């Protein structure tokens, strides 16, 4: 038996079954004590952070999962050393990676930004809302796109999302260019005489991240 992934009740069941692990993690004899580790969990997704992820920590987690009669998803289970070049961690739509300082200083900072999968998903949603078969007026389409963009930006505003936001702005503008071309026999349809696509979209209130 089980529940569909993404089901309404799945997060509730995950919190019930994993609550004991949360508590035991911080009790005497748990990884918080013997490895100075930290546990970050959301529903059934969790990350354990420690300076050294030894076999004792891994074994403790496996025992807790077994005790809850759950099974680890081995496709999503891995041990990483984030300070190695190129190593990264994807969690809850974010990518975490230590990058070299852009000013040339001899240290690294923890770069947090939207993951590749999160960007692919928002691109697909923008394609849906600006598709040729999407029968909406330009103002209505912009209003719906704005709602999705605001929600996405509010979620990913933490860390360093500026590059991802800038790229998404360009992607959305290109999608609206195709949106307008599909509604005219001409290759483009300016909003006003001499008005650029960017200024026209801004006048209609398109959100810029």
Where do the model's predicted regions map?
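Non-catalytic terminal/accessory segments
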Residues: 1-209
């Amino acid at each position: 038996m089980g529940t569909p992934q993404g089901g309404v009740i799945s997060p509730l069941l995950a919190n019930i079954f994993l609550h004991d692990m949360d508590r035991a993690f911080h009790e005497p004899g748990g990884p918080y004590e013997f490895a100075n580790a930290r546990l970050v969990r959301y529903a059934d997704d969790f990350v354990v952070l420690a300076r050294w992820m030894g076999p004792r920590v891994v074994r403790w987690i496996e025992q807790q999962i077994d005790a809850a009669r759950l099974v680890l998803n081995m496709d999503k289970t891995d041990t990483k050393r984030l300070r190695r070049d190129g190593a990264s961690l994807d969690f809850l739509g974010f990518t975490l990676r230590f990058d070299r300082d852009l000013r040339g200083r001899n240290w690294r900072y923890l770069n947090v930004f939207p993951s590749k999968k999160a960007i692919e998903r928002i691109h697909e949603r923008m394609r849906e809302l600006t598709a040729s078969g999407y029968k909406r007026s330009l103002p209505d389409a912009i209003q719906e796109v704005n709602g999705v963009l605001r929600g996405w930006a509010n979620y990913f505003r933490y860390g360093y999302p500026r590059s991802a936001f800038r790229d998404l702005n360009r992607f959305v503008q290109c999608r609206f260019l195709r949106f307008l071309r599909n509604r005219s026999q001409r290759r483009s349809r300016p909003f006003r005489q001499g008005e650029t696509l960017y200024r026209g979209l801004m006048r209609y209130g398109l959100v810029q991240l």
